[in-house]
Amino acid sequence: MKVFILALLALAATTAIAQLETTCSQGFGQSQQQQQPGQRQLLEQMKPCVAFLQQKCSPLRMPFLQTQVEQLSSCQIVQYQCCQQLAQIPERTRCHAIHIVVEAIIQQQSQQQWQEPQQQAQHKSMRMLLENLSLMCNIYVPVQCQQQQQLGQQQQQQLQEQLTPCTTFLQQQCSPVTVPFPQIPVDQPTSCQNVQHQCCRQLSQIPEQFRCQAIHNVAEAIRQQQPQQQWQGMYQPQQPAQLESIRMSLQALRSMCSIYIPVQCPAPTTYNIPLVATYTGGAC
């Protein structure tokens, strides 16, 4: 009996995905033809996630089931398939896979729904769905995977200058101030605390979609100030320690600043070091 029920649920889930596949083939049109084979394969692999996020699966009513038997809905089956597919995708590729899912959903929406000011609400809703997906699947899914916009050289230089306090703080080039009068019951801020405050203030002024690039600029600035031999080659013994130090500093920065900083940033294009892909649970 249970086998029959599970088969029925799987059939319902497959039907939902098949309906989605028809919609996708009609909705994508020319853009689907322009996709590379790897992107098409990812889209096929992520169709359960598209179906689940759009809630195109509907709960099945089975009154004949006993109350102690969990009544799985077709949505739960599709959710399971989605999580299973996500778990099979390498961590460094999940951000790209999620972009494809979001793009598929956007292209299936009517164009007017994605015009301002509705667009901002739609993206916020999508981000919340992806955060829930990360919790439900119990695997690492980037909280925010925003396509890294290409910034001009002048803009990148401005970002780097803006985040000079962060570079200083992460390198701990600020030294605590010696307080000659410890009896004064007023907290004497250290120079590091002042620089930390400046760093957080600068980060908060940078738009969310550019913070990942800004953080990479900070990491690049720190890298360039390290002895050159420590950064040569992809698998030098010194390199993991350097990257781990930066990763831990950025995690601390994320907590101290109390602002949104992407948990995972796309691999930087300015140098050959995969800050994310090298480490499990990758953070910037």
UniProtKB/Swiss-Prot annotation:
InterPro entries listed in its UniProt record: Bifun_inhib/LTP/seed_sf (IPR036312), Bifunc_inhib/LTP/seed_store (IPR016140), Glia_glutenin (IPR001954)
Single Gene Ontology MF annotation: nutrient reservoir activity
Keyword list, A-Z: Disulfide bond, Seed storage protein, Signal, Storage protein
Coiled-coil annotated residue ranges, if any: none
Keyword Disulfide bond: yes
Residues spanning the signal sequence: 1-18
UniProt PTM comment: Contains disulfide bonds.
Intrachain S-S bonds: none
Record SMART domains: AAI
Function: Seed storage protein. Might be integrated via inter-chain disulfide bonds within the glutenin polymer.
Similarity comment text for this entry: Belongs to the prolamin family.
Stated name of the protein: Avenin-like b6
Protein source organism: Triticum aestivum (Wheat)
